[in-house]
């Protein structure tokens, strides 16, 4: 693929075209289905834009919490096992902050218009 436009820019352009040009022309259930598709494209755009950085930050926090290295999925499995075994809990230094930041990062991708998420961003 060429350097410009990027994959993210292409997906955003398609979503914007559908939202601005096609949605107003469609009614009823088909308009609803089209909006679902547009929302999926918007989610993919956010995933491509935000996920790499938030995943790297999550992995760094997990490495510090657990004292081990590994892939993000393996680090999360290790944390889950330690929580299930009672080896770590919310009193463990850094765990609550890690869980909160991970949740906020995931909401930024999945549900950026979620009222509680937006309210929490406003509290910072």
PLM regions: where:
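N-terminal interaction modules that seed assembly of large macromolecular complexes
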Residues: 17-47
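Short alpha-helix boundary/capping elements
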Residues: 39-49, 70, 103-107
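C-terminal amphipathic alpha-helical interaction region
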Residues: 4, 8-14, 58-124
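Non-transmembrane, amphipathic alpha-helical segments
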Residues: 2-6, 22-29, 33, 64, ...
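Short, charged early-sequence alpha-helical segments and their helix-coil boundaries
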Residues: 47-63
């Amino acid at each position: 693929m060429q350097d410009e436009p990027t994959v993210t820019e292409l997906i955003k352009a398609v979503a914007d075209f559908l939202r601005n040009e096609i949605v107003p022309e469609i009614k009823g259930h088909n308009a609803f289905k089209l909006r679902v598709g547009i929302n999926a494209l918007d989610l993919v755009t956010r995933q491509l834009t935000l996920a790499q950085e938030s995943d790297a930050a999550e992995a760094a926090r997990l490495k510090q919490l657990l004292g081990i290295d590994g892939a993000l999925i393996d680090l999360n499995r290790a944390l889950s096992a330690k929580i299930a075994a009672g080896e770590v809990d919310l009193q463990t230094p850094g765990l609550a902050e890690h869980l909160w930041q991970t949740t906020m990062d995931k909401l930024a991708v999945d549900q950026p218009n979620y009222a509680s998420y937006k309210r929490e961003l406003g509290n910072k």
